[in-house]
Amino acid sequence: MGKSESQMDITDINTPKPKKKQRWTPLEISLSVLVLLLTIIAVTMIALYATYDDGICKSSDCIKSAARLIQNMDATAEPCTDFFKYACGGWLKRNVIPETSSRYGNFDILRDELEVVLKDVLQEPKTEDIVAVQKAKTLYRSCINESAIDSRGGEPLLKLLPDVYGWPVATENWEQKYGASWTAEKAIAQLNSKYGKKVLINLFVGTDDKNSVNHVIHIDQPRLGLPSRDYYECTGIYKEACTAYVDFMISVARLIRQEERLPIDENQLALEMNKVMELEKEIANATAKPEDRNDPMLLYKKMTLAQIQNNFSLEINGKPFSWLNFTNEIMSTVNISITNEEDVVVYAPEYLTKLKPILTKYSARDLQNLMSWRFIMDLVSSLSRTYKESRNAFRKALYGTTSETATWRRCANYVNGNMENAVGRLYVEAAFAGESKHVVEDLIAQIREVFIQTLDDLTWMDAETKKRAEEKALAIKERIGYPDDIVSNDNKLNNEYLELNYKEDEYFENIIQNLKFSQSKQLKKLREKVDKDEWISGAAVVNAFYSSGRNQIVFPAGILQPPFFSAQQSNSLNYGGIGMVIGHEITHGFDDNGRNFNKDGDLVDWWTQQSASNFKEQSQCMVYQYGNFSWDLAGGQHLNGINTLGENIADNGGLGQAYRAYQNYIKKNGEEKLLPGLDLNHKQLFFLNFAQVWCGTYRPEYAVNSIKTDVHSPGNFRIIGTLQNSAEFSEAFHCRKNSYMNPEKKCRVW
């Protein structure tokens, strides 16, 4: 650059000779003083401005957090009248449920984003991939290979059906082909042992609740083809689902007969599939309601196989059913021999008693039609487009969706569900900030400490039970992010999937291979000890978990992200996000189910009679509170306060513990800077971030479904119910007494 004029002036060489110095005039003196004063004022103002702190955080992370909160909320709504609208009104205006989704919320958006990461890491093979990762990528490619899947039609399924005694409605001369060799023991066992499909009788190997280091055989009622036993009323809001279900059966039977070039008698198809529906209705009515199955002490009934034979004799196809033969048909596939002295835990004795008269009314053909159908219906979406489309009306009736999930999304989820450690490794390497592990460890320690301190406040619990509750809380083991082995131990990861070998053009066979592998692995556990260090979740999951049998809490890498957590966001948001989730999972150890298990994970009554009675009384308050919520999206049905009790107790306890932990943080570290653009303090931001986790909505069909099947209250009621019980919330938002969000009667368990 050239010199400035001032520089040129200063450095002019031809400087004139100075004149004789003169006195300053009064005006010059006055002006000089004024200039000096103005200079001092200017310098002071600049210094003050440079050091002035307006208490607002202006970092990019604070700006992002504030923008997210502002976008989601409706500041014109009254927080003390409807905090769901206040916290989520903006979100509801900006978002529409995608055609492929049955519900849509902030949780679902996080899951959608995680699926994008999975797609990116699964679709590109790399030369440095270890064998386990190569297999995961092959499985993914086989799943998205729609041209190969479509070209095969229903052929892969047709080849498999003879292995499960066929499907009578889609088989010519079934009685001649299979009838003579058919036995109930073999037919029911074959689906279970090979493919993990439990129809009519649900036999599985799981942890022994009363001795949680051991595995034991369990016998329980089966799952149903429709979402819950209520659907089988087939009237009112359930009528469309029942019609679509039978039509779905008929459509698939027709497709198979067409592909097999067999004659099609529409009347016969309708007759047989309606018979299947009649049978399944009777089975549904024999099952116990969920609210009658929520006490693990009452559910647990251990007996020998010989006692089962005596207590629950069945007659099928005119022959007595041998429980010993049935169990051996299953366990022999993993070379385990069973005698009549084998211990079995029966979860559903009433169901088995009611099953007896039902089974005598139906032929082997009827029973096999149901069993094969229940197997087939799970596999239809793995076949060609024609088969997939036969499910459209059924999917719409249950979920309200008019389009299938994008193939790549479905496939990313499928691979993650079947190879969670291989996929977890890829996800962690691509997207997980490892330093967050230590921060979350510290948060867990703080919230656990608050839980223990809070025990002193509980007037309904005696000292003896408090002491045992403290011991259990201290014994809770935490798992954060991911198991180190999945990243550091290549051999262990490769060995986990050693038996699996996928082909890129055989997606259906790959699925069958996974079913067999998974079921065999589970059955083999019968003679093995429970590995209590095993993680109960993969890493690439947006969720958190508590295991009563392990007394373990798990926070996978997938949930350790905003709005739940970020090392860079305000602590009020972290405590209202992941802090509440931590408190929620800890409290699960003391909800209506978890409280029945001791610090070692065993089903043991460690409560005094008085404390147990008081717990039930305290809980009843929440049963009534949530049971009084009416959900417009589910046709005005009321929530089930009994089925959702455990989650509601955990929500309320978790929020209270996280808030007290945040107050402790402020006492120790001082107030945080406020967020820009929000006229809210950090106590208010704590509650706002908690609420915004649950922003979302449902399709009416899925609302009807989830109100009967989901143990969680819908998101809006998780916000309202929990905050109605929080005096700290009402104090933070200055809610007058008896406003909707600040009722006089408040429920508290923990």
Swiss-Prot record:
Source organism, top-level taxon: Eukaryota
Key words, A-Z: Cell membrane, Disulfide bond, Glycoprotein, Hydrolase, Lipoprotein, Membrane, Metal-binding, Metalloprotease, Myristate, Phosphoprotein, Protease, Signal-anchor, Transmembrane, Transmembrane helix, Zinc
GO molecular function list: cardiolipin binding; metallocarboxypeptidase activity; metalloendopeptidase activity; peptide binding; phosphatidylserine binding; protein homodimerization activity; zinc ion binding
Binding, a peptide: R103
Active-site residues annotated for this sequence: E585, D651 (proton donor)
Family statement drawn from the similarity comment of this UniProt entry: Belongs to the peptidase M13 family.
Record's protein name: Neprilysin
Organism in which the protein naturally occurs: Pongo abelii
